[in-house]
UniProtKB/Swiss-Prot annotation:
Biased composition (Basic and acidic residues): 34-73
Family, as annotated: Belongs to the Tlp family.
Region of interest (Disordered), residue spans: 34-80
Main location: other
Keywords on record: Sporulation
Induction of expression: Expressed only in the forespore compartment of sporulating cells.
Encoding gene per record: tlp
Family matches, as Pfam families: Tlp (PF19824)
Domain of life: Bacteria
Record lineage: Bacteria, Bacillati, Bacillota, Bacilli, Bacillales
Localization in the cell: Spore core
Signal keyword on record: no
InterPro entries xrefs: SASP_thioredoxin-like
Name assigned to this protein: Small, acid-soluble spore protein Tlp
Length: 80
């Protein structure tokens, strides 16, 4: 019988800050595009877009908090 256990990848956090910054930028772009699309949206669609953009803003705040955590961890050598 073959052993199907896969060894987990090592924890590589070296580029987490950059990935999170990209995620913030992409989310901001999505918000801007959504705002532009509201020009052609029905009232119901506008409401959904506004709600989604509110959730996107919450995500951005979470990303920024995580960026701070990751930056601090990077400065401290990723020690637990």
């Amino acid at each position: 019988m073959t052993n199907n256990y896969q060894k987990p990848n090592p924890d590589d956090r070296s580029d987490n800050v950059e990935k999170l910054q990209d995620m913030v930028q992409n989310t901001i772009e999505n918000i801007e595009e959504a705002k532009e699309s509201m020009e052609f949206a029905t009232d119901e669609e506008k409401q959904r877009i506004q709600e989604k953009n509110a959730r996107r803003n919450e995500s951005i705040e979470s990303f920024r908090s995580e960026i701070q955590d990751e930056s601090a961890a990077r400065e401290n050598g990723y020690q637990s």
